């Protein structure tokens, strides 16, 4: 039984960080002929099958492919085409979604590494290994979730709070920008996003920051992809100042920040937590070109302790901790907030709001079509929000036994909380408050691992988990570089027969159409295809395929280590390929209490696997 009340020390997360940044070019003559990636290529990523150019497999992040050469009738013949090992002792969690461009796979790995591989053979073309300092502060393993590509460059973030642009053909550094102090806990784990501002016509590189568990102020950035120069920065704590073209622009929300308590004895006039209030947008953004809006999740407030963000003797419901634990619509021209919807006001449970925002056409019960976002939150509720204005359209639970709220009020958009679910402060003379049993726990009904949406079935395929936690308050004060939580916890089982639950959800009725249970937590993303298939990976190392309509398991392959990444698919030379990054790690083994014990037997790893139908059997591959 394991109890953790703070992130694992940085030194425990890495065998060695004395590595040189380098690029090894192998076969650069052929790579030099590769075409540049245009905005039109990226805008049509979800419709074209030869490349995968965006995190989410398109600007709408649906993770749906029109490919159907591999289908429910022949997937049982799916066979490994090749695998590539990331090598050396640097394993840990491998959460990367690969991208594919012009026959080259770009896949990031733990410890801020990036590999370019021949998509057909797995031959390494080049490697970039970022030099990391000893004092990085990753909360949840040394992961990286992917890269972006545009023009002749590939971009990714690093654990020392930097963004790097590499020549996509050679791996050589084009530019490198530091955006924050890694010693204070800032990192970058999410894949950047490429968007085109509909007003100015400029193509922008959008990225966020990580570090809410260390008391950072979350920030979203826009950069010139050619030079790396910052165009704007938007903080996600109310009352903090943004930047535009290198100068102060506007504060986020109300300059007086009424959603955070005042403190007349503080130099800022606000409580300590306001200066370290979190809200980090550490996942990748989606982009709605029709309304010219960047849509991204905002992280949990800092600290986790609700009473540190509530006036003494006050009610947490009077202090929402804006703009945290919600989804934000941002103007790409200026970085101004266009709209905000908060999933968990004054979030007391580290539910965050960073899970992906999937853009889709929502057909309401009255037949009206709404251009919407879909979001399965860590708090256990599934949200459908009008992406033109941030107004709630529908909300329902997607996991069992939610304790903290009974439902979401569709008129007010706010949760209806249950009494006693905000853990109380310690009694006088006590270090810890009374523990409360909460579900979902802070790791969520679903965490960062992205769901998929099928344009054929109209269903969302959600990689959920059933678990709970004992949760209690502790004393908290800010120290640079130290965990800023004010809470203790122990995660526990909910059911004896499973933790993971892959669920097909109807976004209109809120009903579970089918469910597949897994013994271990699900931490991999999901892919849906026109072949009536759904793919995901499991904690015990299986890459699996399911019938999208019935949920029947049709195929599986043991990769040798747990899978905690989103799969992809593409077409090359008339053949459909599927790829997935393999290597167990991430937050569960570090923070997961009883769940960490459950997953301890899983071997670590670091590799990329590619599958296809046997070439000799493409014409006859059917039952």
From Swiss-Prot:
Keyword Transcription: no
Alphabetical list of InterPro entries matching this protein: ADHI, PQQ_b-propeller_rpt, PQQ_MeOH/EtOH_DH, PQQ_rpt_dom, Quinoprotein_ADH-like_sf, Quinoprotein_DH_CS
Main location: periplasm
Reaction equations catalysed: a primary alcohol + 2 Fe(III)-[cytochrome c] = an aldehyde + 2 Fe(II)-[cytochrome c] + 2 H(+); ethanol + 2 Fe(III)-[cytochrome c] = acetaldehyde + 2 Fe(II)-[cytochrome c] + 2 H(+); butan-1-ol + 2 Fe(III)-[cytochrome c] = butanal + 2 Fe(II)-[cytochrome c] + 2 H(+); propan-2-ol + 2 Fe(III)-[cytochrome c] = acetone + 2 Fe(II)-[cytochrome c] + 2 H(+)
Induction line: Induced by growth on ethanol.
Co-factor(s): pyrroloquinoline quinone; Ca(2+)
pH-linked activity: Optimum pH is 9 in assays using artificial electron acceptors. However, in a system with homogenous QEDH, cytochrome c550 and a membrane fraction of P.aeruginosa, electron transport from ethanol to O(2) is observed at the more physiological conditions of pH 7, and the system is inactive at pH 9.
Signal peptide from the UniProt entry: 1-34
Region span, Disordered: 244-281, 413-434
Function: Catalyzes the oxidation of ethanol and other primary alcohols to the corresponding aldehydes, except methanol, which is a very poor substrate. Uses a specific inducible cytochrome c550, encoded by the adjacent gene in the locus, as electron acceptor. Is a key enzyme of the carbon and energy metabolism during growth of P.aeruginosa on ethanol as the sole carbon and energy source. Is also able to use secondary alcohols as well as aminoalcohols like ethanolamine and 1-amino-2-propanol, and aldehydes as substrates.
Protein name per its UniProtKB record: Quinoprotein ethanol dehydrogenase
Species whose genome carries this gene: Pseudomonas aeruginosa (strain ATCC 15692 / DSM 22644 / CIP 104116 / JCM 14847 / LMG 12228 / 1C / PRS 101 / PAO1)
Lineage: Bacteria, Pseudomonadati, Pseudomonadota, Gammaproteobacteria, Pseudomonadales
Gene from which the chain derives: exaA
